[in-house]
Design a protein with these regions (language model features):
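N-proximal low-complexity "stem/linker" segments adjacent to membrane-targeting elements
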Residues: 1-26
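Glycine-rich, basic loop-to-helix element that forms the pyrophosphate-binding segment
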Residues: 68-84, 105
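Conserved donor NDP-sugar-binding/catalytic core segment of glycosyltransferases
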Residues: 101-135
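Short, flexible, basic/aromatic active-site loop/helix in glycosyltransferases
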Residues: 121, 138-160
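A short, conserved alpha-helix in the catalytic core of glycosyltransferases
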Residues: 164-178, 183-217
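Catalytic core of nucleotide-sugar-dependent glycosyltransferases
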Residues: 192, 205-209, 215-218, 228-254
Length: 270
């Protein structure tokens, strides 16, 4: 019986996807207890062929690929939720790798807390070319979104929510919240996001607790291309666009503007 599903959205990153899958197939759960659903979001590279070859080389791992034509990661994640066969669904992205106990950690968490609906795990930044000497935690936050809140299961700290590349849900508890907003989220390589924060905000407003599960570890792989001034300026601009879109959706633009200015001012002081 499939007890937990893992969903990986992907768009034109076949090589990175295969690297992510290499870590997925090493999960320490019995193979008949989990599945992995890759959602190819309008990929035009060799994603389908490379996935098929990888799946053929790893029979019995419950790997399958579905195509989603709706543009953007929100459409892909919503498709993954619909396709998942298990009552529990975890998400990672295609530029990551996970520990062998990733799915087990989430499975054991939800089984011991039957009222829990949402959780997120530890995120570690990984730099294949080495961590730059100039990197600070304030620059690393928007680029890699690292998270480490200790060694015990606990609610997420106030003001923090899971990263979209390491989150898990109990499907039965999501019915009243809808899915990820398709007007938010990255499309065709653009850096506009905010769909995860929007979803988590709805869950919090609904009275849910977001739990931190330290045993679900994800390494976010940061290539040299994401360590340039041009990339950081583009990312910073699109973070602002994402915040504005979310503020307009929730009709709180003035409050959001003041809060974001305060946060950026604090990072400059610190």
């Amino acid at each position: 019986m499939i007890r937990i599903s893992l969903v990986i959205p992907t768009h034109n990153r076949a090589a990175q996807l295969v690297a992510a899958l290499e870590s997925v197939v090493r999960q320490d759960l019995p193979r008949d207890e989990w599945e992995c659903v890759v959602v190819s979001n309008n990929s035009t590279d060799d994603t389908e062929a490379r996935f098929a070859a990888f799946a053929a080389a790893h029979p019995g791992c419950g790997l399958r690929l579905v195509a989603e034509e709706g543009p953007g990661v929100s459409y892909a994640r919503n498709r993954g939720l619909r396709e998942a066969q298990a009552p529990l669904v975890a998400f990672i992205d295609d530029d990551e790798r996970v520990n062998e106990g990733f799915l087990r950690a989430y499975l054991e968490f939800f089984e011991t807390r039957p009222g829990a609906v949402v959780a997120g795990g530890r995120i570690v930044a990984e730099y294949p070319a080495g961590r730059p000497a100039w990197m600070s935690k304030y620059v690393e936050m928007p680029i890699a979104n690292p998270m480490d809140f200790g060694e015990r299961v606990r609610p997420f700290p106030a003001g923090r929510v899971p990263g979209g590349g390491n989150m898990a849900f109990r499907r039965a508890g999501l019915a009243s919240y809808g899915g990820f907003d398709p007007t938010l989220g990255r499309v065709n390589g653009e850096l506009i996001g905010g769909e995860e924060n929007d979803f988590f905000e709805r869950l919090l407003l609904g009275g849910e607790t977001i739990w931190y599960v330290p045993g679900a570890v994800m390494w976010h792989i940061i290539p040299p291309a994401k360590l340039t001034g041009a990339y950081f300026r583009r990312l910073s601009y699109n973070v602002g666009v994402s915040q504005r879109l979310r503020a307009e959706i929730h009709r709180r633009l003035p409050k959001t503007f003041v809060l974001e200015i305060a946060k950026w001012a604090a990072t400059l002081v610190l």
